[in-house]
Amino acid sequence: MNKPDVAKVAGEYERILVEFFELSAGLAPRFDLILLGMGNDGHTASLFPGTEVLNERTRLVAAPWVEKLNGYRFTMTLPVLNNAATVVFLVCGEEKSGILKEVLEGPPDQYPAQAIKPATGQLTWLIDRAAASKLKS
């Protein structure tokens, strides 16, 4: 899919969200629950480190180019994710233990997963023992 096509598809997905949630201009939908995972690089949804989509504040849906994947990825943007009533991260496996420690105990604002901060909602991390193995507590 080329850039004009992905922009069109992202725009259509956004239009559907606006229509379904009966949104006024500039408002983000409020999902009851959003389930997220986290990649070994600290990405979540399709919000990857170093991509411009992390700075998006007006669009609800974007299709950023992800260099390491050599392709576009569709994602809801931070205004949508952070407007949810509840966001739950599911993180499993020893291979995630290092990045989980960095995300939860390291400096803030280093990884996309750290940008998930529901404005008026709840954030929950569900992690297994292997993923938690490097955490302090």
Q: Which sequence ranges carry the predicted segments?
A:
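Conserved phosphate- and dinucleotide-binding cores of soluble alpha/beta proteins
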Residues: 2-137
